[in-house]
Swiss-Prot record:
Belongs to the semaphorin family. Residues 1-14 form the signal peptide. Keywords: Secreted, Signal. Residues 15-399 form the Sema domain. InterPro entries: Semap_dom (IPR001627), Semap_dom_sf (IPR036352), Semaphorin (IPR027231), WD40/YVTN_repeat-like_dom_sf (IPR015943). It comes from Ectromelia virus (strain Moscow). This is Semaphorin-like protein 139. It comes from the Viruses. SMART domains: Sema (SM00630). The gene is EVM139. SUPFAM superfamilies: Sema domain.
Length: 399
């Protein structure tokens, strides 16, 4: 299939819009090697070097939920209930991947690739329980979480970070506890990327190092507990985790966490509800290649996978914003080490927050915004096309 080049663009409010031929329902956006991939029904748009291209795939209820780089860059979609992947030029994926790379029906997904190891929260069967899964590849064979470990609405962030000599996978999600009243609890969970699975034939494809710990984001008696989106940014000696939370208070908040502190908690905290002496190796410890956790360690982590700890943010929320925020991204300011401009979007409004001046500004656009991605300039992905540039914004005195 031949990609089509779109050259129609116009400026509005200092944003250069590269327009789609028709208004699109945006399904997914991914930034891979400074190329923006935007999935729609039956096609994927690519945007780089100020050029917008479209590759048609099929129009048979094929919602493109995934763009991912494994050996090649793949785009994957629902394909009318038969998930399938293609190369970016529209040709067939020679490995015929699809299940677990795209859902059976259009839904929000989380999928990442690290050194060609692929991990996702996408069901591999139509009626399957939501799980966090590692696919067969360079990091080992298929692994998945136990029943009901991952909430039905899935994961809201995933990344790999090094802890000592081991690579570890981190995922973020919000659990809902429904007892006398509904309580939402935000978590970050940790697993060893090269986990060898459980010690028996029944557990050999289960994560054997899964642990989780609660995140706190509170200000003035308001507790933010619904994770919307997250982003990890490496610094010289740490990785800073930015997490956007929603709440019932008509407000949202952005909190930051030190991954060094989170890793320390995973390695030193007690397990909630477990009172006996821990075996060796302790639950959650990464083992050398070829080593499998013993039964005693695995049995404990199956029953007690939550730390008796709560991770505090580095400070109070960086800022509070409106509820209903869909997405955010961060740009380090030129010549300002560790000073950032944070862009976030809601409906047809773009917001920016300056971490140095503590000022929030906003601008409205005549488009339905889906996401924002930051390269050398912010990219605003909307139903009408891709917007490039910093809009002319008005200062907000109070959110």
């Amino acid at each position: 299939m031949i990609p089509l080049l779109f050259i129609l663009f116009y400026f509005t409010n200092c944003i250069e819009w590269h327009k789609f031929e028709t208004s699109e329902e945006i399904i997914s956006t991914y930034l891979i090697d400074d190329v923006l991939y935007t999935g729609v029904n039956g096609a994927v748009y690519t945007f780089s070097n100020n050029e917008l291209n479209k590759t048609g795939l099929t129009n048979n209820n094929n919602y493109i939920t995934t763009s991912i780089k494994v050996e090649d860059t793949l785009v994957c979609g629902t394909n009318n209930g038969n998930p399938k992947c293609w190369k970016i030029d529209g040709s067939e994926d020679p490995k015929y991947r699809g299940r677990g790379y795209a859902p059976y029906q259009n839904s929000k997904v989380t999928i990442i690739s690290h050194n060609e190891c692929v991990l996702s929260d996408i069901n591999i069967s139509k009626e399957g329980i939501k799980r966090w899964r590692r696919f067969d590849g360079p990091c080992g064979y298929d692994l998945y979480t136990a029943d009901n470990v991952i909430p039905k609405d899935g994961v809201r962030g995933a990344f790999v970070d090094k802890d000592g000599t081991y690579d570890k996978v981190y995922i973020l999600f919000t659990d809902t506890i429904d007892t006398k009243r509904i309580v939402k609890i935000p978590y970050i969970a940790q697993m060893c990327l090269n986990d060898e699975g459980g010690p028996s034939s029944l557990s050999s494809h289960r994560w054997s190092t899964f642990l989780k710990v609660e995140l706190e984001c509170d200000i003035d008696g308001r507790s933010y507990r619904q994770i919307i989106h997250s982003k990890a940014i490496k610094t010289d000696n740490d990785t800073i985790l930015y997490v956007f939370f929603d709440s019932p208070y008509s407000k949202s908040a952005l909190c930051t966490y030190s991954m060094n502190a989170i890793k320390h908690s995973f390695s030193t905290s007690k397990l909630g509800g477990y009172t006996k002496q821990l075996p060796s190796p302790a639950p959650g410890i990464c083992l050398p290649a070829g080593k499998v956790v013993p039964h005693t360690t695995f049995d404990i982590i199956e029953q007690y996978n939550e730390l008796d700890d709560i991770i505090k943010p580095l400070s109070q929320p960086i800022f509070e914003g409106p509820s209903g925020v869909k997405w955010f991204d961060i740009k380090e300011k030129e010549n300002e080490h560790r000073e950032y401009r944070i862009y976030f979007i809601k409906e047809n409004t773009i917001y920016s927050f300056d971490t140095k001046s503590k000022q929030t500004r906003s601008a409205q656009v005549d488009a339905r915004l889906f996401s924002v991605m930051v390269t050398s300039k912010p990219l605003f992905i909307a139903d009408i096309g891709i917007g490039v540039g910093i809009p002319r914004m008005k200062k907000i005195l109070k959110m």
